[in-house]
């Protein structure tokens, strides 16, 4: 089921996340770091290191917006959110066909967590 939720981030939150990501510098790492055995051979992108302060700042903004959004809450029924991950694609980068892993270890709780819901990055895409 696809549920489109427009404008999860208001203009100020979107501008804040974009500014943080634009200034992230060395926090951008090879996206294959979080890819499983199936995804690693076809994943050619960059993502923010989940341990970086910029990741935590962006995660807080996005997670707070999702937690306030009644459409997200009613569609996803989340008990616990995996901290959002931030990826980018420069010229020539791709992410080929693969299946994302359905379970990850939550970095703050150590609990196994289903990750079969994802957010399309349209809100952060440059327009």
Segments from the language model and where they lie:
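Catalytic core of non-heme Fe(II) oxygenases with the double-stranded beta-helix
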Residues: 70-127
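Non-heme Fe(II)/2-oxoglutarate
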Residues: 1-85
């Amino acid at each position: 089921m696809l549920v489109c939720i427009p404008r999860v981030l208001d203009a100020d939150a979107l501008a804040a996340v974009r500014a943080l990501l634009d200034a992230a510098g060395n926090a951008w790492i090879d996206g294959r770091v979080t890819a499983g055995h199936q995804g690693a051979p076809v994943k050619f992108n960059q993502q923010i290191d989940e341990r970086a302060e910029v990741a935590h700042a962006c995660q807080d903004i996005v997670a707070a917006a999702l937690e306030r959004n009644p459409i997200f809450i009613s569609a996803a029924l989340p008990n616990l959110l995996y901290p959002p991950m931030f990826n980018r694609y420069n010229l020539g980068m791709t992410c080929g066909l693969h299946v994302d892993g359905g379970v990850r270890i939550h970095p703050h709780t150590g609990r196994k967590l289903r990750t079969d819901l994802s957010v399309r990055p349209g809100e952060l895409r440059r327009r």
